[in-house]
Structure formats: structure tokens, C-alpha cells
A protein has these predicted regions:
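Bacterial N-terminal signal peptides
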Residues: 6-16
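Low-complexity, acidic/polar, glycine-enriched regions of mature
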Residues: 20-207
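Positively charged n-region of N-terminal signal peptides that target proteins for export
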Residues: 1-4
Length: 207
């Protein structure tokens, strides 16, 4: 499924008063062009960055249902598939090494699945922690991703960032030039999302 639902609605759900009286809440999410997934890394010589525009792995318009139980947020759609070969970088050598490292021919897609979000008491800023399963080269690991958000009317921005160790996925950092160039085992995954979020009934009124 080329659908990303995992974090987009947290701010709205914690700030809409009627949600407290509902078991579920239907929403319309319009994803903006600035949305981006970035993987950052470094070696002992140079830093590198891989970018993938949101349009490559997220539908522009999504209809979702969210529910809140015991202070946790659950979503009806919770899977994200990231095509590995859609990443771009100005460092072509690093990008080739990345494809080789994650075996992009054998495993062309990275999988991210949201279990749930533990909501904080803050409607904005640090709004909670997302428990997410990340699958790379067929190996799945669970991480806690902190979620930050800002709101301006129906426009929301979400900033989700986490440093992980590639050895968690049984991957070995590349080494070049007889050991003179070594890639660090830590990478930082950063998902930035900008979107408009409205309850379905309000969205239908302004169509």
C-alpha cells in the first residue's frame, strides 16, 4: 500500500474538542508539496543526505479514521512503503553505496508500520511518541519516534526525527580506500510533513 497515515492527524485529534466524545473520527488529509523524507549519514571524510519527495510515496489526498483509547492514538491505515530507488542525492557515490548496503534490487521497498502513538498532554510542540516498526532488507525493528507539530488554521506541519544504528538490521557500514574512508553506523531518519487536515463533514462543505 502506497499510503502513509501514521502521524498526520495527531495535532488535530488532540485539539478538536468533539473528539473526546467520539470513539472514532473520520478525516480528510491533503498532503502538500514540501513534504519530504530524508536520511542523513556521515563518514570520517564527508556528510551525505538522501532525499525523497513526499509525492513519491504518499497519496496527495487521503481519507482516514482515527480512534483514541487509553491515551493512545490508533489509525485505520498505518502502513508506509518507501521505494528505495526513489531517493536522490548530490553525492552519487554515497547513493550507490546506500543501494548496495540495503540491497535495493532484492529489497526495493522499505516498510514502516505504525503501531500506535502515545499522546502527551501538549496539543502542539512535542505532542507524543510514535511506536513504529521499521523493516529494511527483511529485518524488522521497533523504535520510538518523537513527534513535533505546529498548527496554523487547518494547516499542520509534522517533524519526526530519529537516529538509528544500521547494525540493528544486520548491515555493515561501507569501508573504502583500504579503510581510509569509513561510513558511520548511525543514520538519522527525518520525515517532514505539511498538510491540510479537516473533518470529513467540513471538507465536504467546502468542496
Amino acid at each position: 500500500m502506497n499510503r502513509f497515515i501514521s502521524i498526520l492527524t495527531i495535532c488535530l485529534l488532540t485539539s478538536v474538542g468533539t473528539f473526546a466524545q467520539l470513539n472514532s473520527y473520520p478525516l480528510v488529509v491533503d498532503v502538500m508539496e514540501k513534504s519530504m523524507l530524508t536520511i542523513q549519514g556521515k563518514s570520517n571524510v564527508v556528510d551525505f543526505k538522501f532525499d525523497q519527495p513526499g509525492e513519491k510515496f504518499i497519496k496527495k489526498k487521503m481519507y482516514i479514521t482515527a480512534s483514541r483509547r487509553d491515551g493512545n492514538l490508533y489509525l485505520s491505515e498505518k502502513n508506509l512503503e518507501i521505494p528505495v530507488k526513489n531517493f536522490m542525492s548530490s553525492n552519487k557515490m554515497a547513493l550507490r553505496d546506500f543501494h548496495k548496503l540495503v540491497k535495493s534490487d532484492e529489497y526495493p521497498v522499505m516498510h514502516i508500520e505504525l503501531d500506535h502513538v502515545r499522546l502527551s498532554d501538549e496539543p502542539l510542540g512535542d505532542i507524543g511518541d510514535a511506536l513504529i516498526d521499521v523493516t529494511i532488507t527483511g529485518v524488522t525493528r521497533r523504535y520510538t519516534f518523537p513527534v513535533k507539530a505546529e498548527k496554523n488554521g487547518s494547516n499542520f506541519t509534522f517533524d519526526i526525527k530519529k537516529s538509528i544504528n544500521i547494525r540493528d538490521f544486520n548491515l555493515t557500514p561501507p569501508v573504502h580506500m583500504m579503510g581510509m574512508l569509513k561510513v558511520d553506523e548511525w543514520i538519522t531518519i527525518n520525515l517532514f510533513m505539511e498538510c491540510d487536515i479537516l473533518p470529513v463533514d467540513q471538507a465536504e462543505l467546502i468542496r
